[in-house]
């Protein structure tokens, strides 16, 4: 009995020693591999840190000297989120202004992290480079268009757009910028949200609930009205068609295959041409649906000699004309993101 007790005690001690050794070896991340900063790197970090504190978060470089010193410097001891843009109407556009305003708005969320105690352990700075003052940096990186939002990691690697460019210009928000930073640096900056941003889902859900109740009451009262069901069918068709075109235009980010060059290329996302074409598609289709609805709901009932069969035939002819109209509109607006005709490559990429 004594012998078995001693064996159990020895095995328990051995188990504790093994677990303790494992915890000491793998339990905490090793900091011995972290290379200490040189005096020049510390000075560079402190200089940019002071400028960020004075600027309230976002630093705007006004000269090539500043951008060379902090952006294209060797052995950068910090990460950068750099917006390459222009306020000059000669170069800039509405997208530049919108993105710059969004970055400046994001500084409200970034400033608490800038002032936190652990900032210098994982430093990241947000900078804005205007093309008028930083042309050399634009040429060095190879930027021919604006705006560009790039994540620039610490170190001495050449700055590149591949894999480090922000692509969500159409739906830019503080949350999407925060997610972009986290995806590259694992630094989580919680965006400051307004009352509407915090509770928009709840507000929208409540509005939809009230609208649904109202619709059910109306549907019950109008259940014997043929024109109500005509209107409902048209509305359903319109929503489906609009949804198809919206989905086709906006997502996902397809590639098209160039058979001559044997390369894949992005479908164009040019904001101006896309806005014009999309607006015409949605606008003309909405007008067509409205006219047909007015005809079916107001003019058609006044003709008593029209049978229900004739009304049904006119309805389906109207809906067919809408579908044909939308198809020919898609032929008319064959910009890059419509080319070739409704061809979706077998290889697609989702971001």
Swiss-Prot record:
Specify the superkingdom: Eukaryota
Q: Where in the cell is it found?
A: Endoplasmic reticulum membrane
Reported function:
Subunit of the oligosaccharyl transferase (OST) complex that catalyzes the initial transfer of a defined glycan (Glc(3)Man(9)GlcNAc(2) in eukaryotes) from the lipid carrier dolichol-pyrophosphate to an asparagine residue within an Asn-X-Ser/Thr consensus motif in nascent polypeptide chains, the first step in protein N-glycosylation. N-glycosylation occurs cotranslationally and the complex associates with the Sec61 complex at the channel-forming translocon complex that mediates protein translocation across the endoplasmic reticulum (ER). All subunits are required for a maximal enzyme activity.
Pfam families to which the protein is assigned, alphabetical: OST3_OST6
The major lineage groups are:
Eukaryota, Amoebozoa, Evosea, Eumycetozoa, Dictyostelia
Asked if the Swiss-Prot or TrEMBL record annotates the protein with the keyword Chaperone, the reply is no
Which organism encodes this protein?
A: Dictyostelium discoideum (Social amoeba)
Q: Where mainly found?
A: endoplasmic reticulum
Name-wise, this protein is Probable dolichyl-diphosphooligosaccharide--protein glycosyltransferase subunit 3
């Amino acid at each position: 009995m004594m012998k078995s007790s001693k064996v159990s005690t020895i095995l328990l001690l051995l188990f504790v020693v093994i677990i303790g050794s494992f915890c000491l070896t793998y339990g905490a991340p090793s900091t011995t591999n972290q290379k200490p900063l040189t005096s020049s790197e510390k000075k560079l970090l402190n200089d940019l840190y002071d400028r960020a504190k004075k600027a309230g978060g976002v630093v705007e470089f006004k000269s090539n000297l500043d951008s060379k010193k902090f952006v294209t410097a060797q052995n950068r001891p910090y990460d950068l989120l750099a917006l390459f843009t222009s306020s000059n109407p000669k170069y800039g556009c509405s997208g530049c202004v919108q993105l710059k305003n969004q970055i400046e708005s994001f500084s409200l969320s970034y400033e608490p992290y800038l002032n936190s105690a652990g900032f210098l352990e994982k430093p990241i700075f947000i900078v804005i480079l205007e093309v008028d003052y930083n042309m050399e940096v634009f040429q060095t990186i190879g930027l021919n268009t604006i705006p560009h939002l790039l994540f620039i990691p610490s170190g001495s690697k050449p700055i590149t757009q591949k894999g480090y460019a922000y692509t969500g210009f159409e739906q830019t928000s503080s949350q999407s910028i925060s997610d972009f930073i986290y995806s590259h640096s694992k630094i989580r900056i919680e965006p400051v949200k307004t009352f509407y941003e915090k509770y928009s889902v709840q507000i929208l859900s409540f509005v939809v609930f009230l609208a649904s109740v109202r619709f059910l009451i109306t549907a019950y009262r109008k259940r014997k009205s043929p024109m109500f069901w005509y209107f409902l069918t048209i509305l359903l068709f319109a929503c489906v068609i609009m949804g198809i075109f919206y989905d086709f235009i906006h997502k996902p980010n397809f590639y098209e295959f160039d058979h001559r060059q044997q390369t894949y290329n992005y479908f164009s996302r040019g904001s101006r041409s896309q806005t014009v074409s999309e607006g015409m598609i949605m606008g003309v289709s909405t007008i067509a649906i409205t006219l047909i609805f007015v005809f079916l709901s107001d003019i058609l009932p006044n003709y008593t000699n029209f049978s229900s069969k004739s009304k049904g035939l006119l309805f389906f002819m109207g809906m067919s004309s809408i579908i044909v109209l939308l198809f020919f509109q898609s032929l008319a607006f064959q910009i890059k993101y419509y080319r070739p005709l409704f061809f979706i490559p077998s290889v697609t990429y989702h971001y």
